Amino acid sequence: MAAVAVVGGQWGDEGKGKITDFLSKDATMAVRSNGGNNAGHTIDIDGKEFKMRLIPSGIFAASKAAVIGNGVVINPEVMFGELDNLEKNGIDTSKLRISNRAHIIMPYDVKQDEYQEEAKGDRKIGTTKNGIGPTYMDKASRIGIRVCDLLEKDTFEEKLRLNLKVKNELFTKVYGKPALKLEDIFDKYYEYGQKMKKYVTDTSVLVNDALDNGEKVLFEGAQGTMLDIDEGTYPYVTSSNTISGGICSGIGMGANRLNTVIGVCKAYTTRVGEGPFPTELLDEVGDRIRDTAHEYGTVTGRPRRVGWFDSVALRHAKRVSGINGLSLNLLDVFSGFDKIKICTAYELDGKKIEYYPASLKELYRCKPVYEELPAWEEDITAAKKLDDLPENAQKFLNRVSELVGVPLVTVSVGPDREQTIVLKNPWER
């Protein structure tokens, strides 16, 4: 049995798609277990860029199956749009498998997300307004519509009718918005269910059987640890558990199944939306990093907030996700810089701390304590091994690993799959 999980070590957008695509070429199965179409990932294949939000990155390379687990919330329109695009580009999509227990993002969930965010005014949290939060709310309230419900016409109609009664009360009486009509939703979504049927199975059984048979299974995390609903910068977080524990519940398997948990990070830090960000750069250095790395959201197109590497946040991610291997991306961005800074601790009310505070008020008062390292002039995008990198780049990598307390397993020096330096094969235990 070989089970490797890839989780975001920062606030998402760390480049998980690239490393999962790289690792999936040796996997029989690639599994996604949380989030929805709020979690974009970009894959470069032979110079062609694919931007996806729902389909697992492993669709390109995993030999047996690319799996959407029960913890994922699915927007059928988005999913079929991605499938159509893949098929037009010659990608085989027949190996997609969808959990019969996954929840469906309904039109009223998208509307509720939009109305709630609008009503918050200045207190908005920066949601993508894709209906992710309300769908997880429906799930927790036990009124959610699952994939298996879409396949049963009578069940689907009954649940939809009841849910619309509840949602329309909210829309008309609280938000002053128009009610939604059953006939505008039912036929379209039932048809989605029929189109989805050929992909649907009990993915918990599928994945656990593969592990029992000694197959290599890759688990793709979505978003990042600092967006986890319990361990992140609450309330500026997503609606699901993005840590490694969420992978287990989001596919239906025991925690003892995971052998390796790889934490993916950038050589700096980014964040989209509102919320505390201790190392944020609001100067020309931040602009330079953003422009060099094209730091704009895959889903929203919004400019990402940019900051120096934060080892305090990554140590927090290591602890709560059990990270035992580090995958660092976008090292090439710092070619031509004079210096690089790493946050080693915070200063809170005159005291040095090395933990990540739960209190937002404390976080906003935290000042980063920096260590400065020299950068390098050389173009490193053709580097194939660690020794090909300039001495200063190697020193930076060693210091990151030392501060986080986790060995590096891969280093990315460019966007293409092959621009990856492997220090340790994650599939080898």
UniProtKB/Swiss-Prot annotation:
Homodimer. NCBIfam families: PRK01117.1, purA. It is an enzyme of class 6 (ligase). Mg(2+) binds at residues 13, 40. Keywords: Cytoplasm, GTP-binding, Ligase, Magnesium, Metal-binding, Nucleotide-binding, Purine biosynthesis. PANTHER family: ADENYLOSUCCINATE SYNTHETASE (PTHR11846:SF0). Gene3D superfamilies: Adenylosuccinate Synthetase, subunit A, domain 1, Adenylosuccinate Synthetase, subunit A, domain 2, Adenylosuccinate Synthetase, subunit A, domain 3. Binds 1 Mg(2+) ion per subunit. Plays an important role in the de novo pathway of purine nucleotide biosynthesis. Catalyzes the first committed step in the biosynthesis of AMP from IMP. It comes from Lactobacillus helveticus (strain DPC 4571). Belongs to the adenylosuccinate synthetase family. Pathway: Purine metabolism; AMP biosynthesis via de novo pathway; AMP from IMP: step 1/2. GO terms for cellular component: cytoplasm. Disulfide bonds: none annotated. One of its GO terms (biological process) is 'de novo' AMP biosynthetic process. This is Adenylosuccinate synthetase. GO terms for molecular function: adenylosuccinate synthase activity; GTP binding; magnesium ion binding. Its EC number is 6.3.4.4. The active site is at 13 (proton acceptor), 41 (proton donor). Its cofactor is Mg(2+). The lineage of its organism: Bacteria, Bacillati, Bacillota, Bacilli, Lactobacillales. It comes from the Bacteria.
